[in-house]
Amino acid sequence: MKEKIHPKYNTATNVICACGNTFTVGSTKDNIKVELCAQCHPFYTGEKRMVDTAGRVEKFRQRYGSKT
């Protein structure tokens, strides 16, 4: 492997969820922000709630307008 071309690997990268939960993982990034984690995802919590903030179709309709 070539030397001095690989990114620096951080063993303590903070992952911050939108729900406020934080945990530490290893990554090449300093901080990672996510929308869902195991503490708030409906699959893990058993709650039924809408997760999608804006789907692809809605984004397309906002950008180009609905023809129907």
UniProtKB/Swiss-Prot annotation:
GO cellular component: ribonucleoprotein complex; ribosome
Keywords: Metal-binding, Ribonucleoprotein, Ribosomal protein, RNA-binding, rRNA-binding, Zinc
UniProt remark on cofactor binding: Binds 1 zinc ion per subunit.
Listed GO biological process terms: translation
Residue sites binding Zn(2+) per the record: 17, 19, 37, 40
InterPro entries on file: Ribosomal_bL28/bL31-like_sf, Ribosomal_bL31, Ribosomal_bL31_A, Ribosomal_bL31_sf
Molecular function terms from GO: metal ion binding; rRNA binding; structural constituent of ribosome
Reported cofactor(s): Zn(2+)
Family: Belongs to the bacterial ribosomal protein bL31 family. Type A subfamily.
Self-association and partners: Part of the 50S ribosomal subunit.
Chain's role: Binds the 23S rRNA.
Record-linked NCBIfam families: L31, PRK00019.1, PRK00528.1
The protein's name: Large ribosomal subunit protein bL31
Classification of source organism: Bacteria, Bacillati, Chloroflexota, Dehalococcoidia, Dehalococcoidales
